[in-house]
Amino acid sequence: MAEAANVRQNLQNVPSIFEISASETLDNLIYPALSKIFDYFGLRLDFKLWGSLRIQEELSPLLTWLLQYLYLRKRASSFGESFYGLQRTVTTTGDLLNRRQQFASATLLTFMPYVERKLRTRITRHEDTSPWEQRLLSAFHAFHAAKAAHTFFYLVKYASNHSPIFRLLGLTLRYPSEPPKEDQWTYVVLKMLEVLAFFLQFVQWWYSNDQRRKVGGTLINPEAMPRKQLPKEVQQSLPQRGECPVCLLSIQTPTACSVSGYVFCWKCIVSHMKEHGTCPVTHYPISLDDLVRIYET
């Protein structure tokens, strides 16, 4: 079987789309894996760095970039590509990557998913997005469409690369013609990282199964929260049906507060939450995650 695999690599030096897709999936697991490591070891790194930025959210992409750049420097491939025995080469000459291509590859591998993840998180939380953020998200949609087209042309052997990024950098994926030359220290470190990838996949599987067992074994309704008696002046000022408790007008963009159950205008409840951090009616503490947009049909 090993001899047949070697013959295949010699006769056909082009990896299949399944190997490429698997390597991309493994690359995309680095960021959540680092976040899980921080949580598992109890590293209290989730505090504000500047504005809305949090140090854990910004440290993980930086470590991801360092890991990808290390692999691109030593093996001319990303972490996932090296795991599946692939290598990046120049499309026209077949040479390995130069420093500029290594830096650009590591940057695009890390910060494109980072920016897209940030934008999608803001949209999921129904936060207001600026026009340039909307245009940037549209650009990501166009990129994914272009990547799907490149993948199709790669499948029918009409294109030498599977992604617009590879086409932009003038690169393609191939099986290495010879094993990478690296010192003993580098070999040990990279092998430890590959073993860590197996370990992380096992931990993820074990954790998901453990959570499933816990949820399946304790399907008991939680106790009701103690009812807070509202002051008389608050009870008298409660709005009529269909009115926002804050502006006392007809509700626009209805948004429910999961803590109290009241429905407000989106702008009213967000403005009040940012200023006071509580529900306007019950004065229970709330956060942006407690607000649920209601889409009427």
Curated annotation (Swiss-Prot):
Zinc fingers (RING-type) by residue: 244-283
Membrane topology summary: Multi-pass membrane protein
Pathway membership: Protein modification; protein ubiquitination
Gene3D superfamilies: Zinc/RING finger domain, C3HC4 (zinc finger)
Peroxisomal matrix side: 1-16, 74-98, 159-191
Top-level taxonomic group: Eukaryota
Protein residues bound to Zn(2+): 244, 247, 265, 268
GO biological process: peroxisome organization; protein import into peroxisome matrix; protein import into peroxisome matrix, receptor recycling; protein monoubiquitination; protein polyubiquitination
Primary localization: membrane
Topological domains annotated Cytoplasmic: 45-48, 120-124, 220-297
Residues that span the membrane, as ranges: 17-44, 49-73, 99-119, 125-158, 192-219
Stated family: Belongs to the pex2/pex10/pex12 family.
Assembly mode: Component of the PEX2-PEX10-PEX12 retrotranslocation channel.
PANTHER family registered for this protein in UniProt: PEROXISOME ASSEMBLY PROTEIN 12, PEROXISOME ASSEMBLY PROTEIN 12 PEROXIN-12
Protein name per the record: Peroxisome assembly protein 12
Species for this entry: Drosophila melanogaster
Higher taxonomy: Eukaryota, Metazoa, Ecdysozoa, Arthropoda, Hexapoda
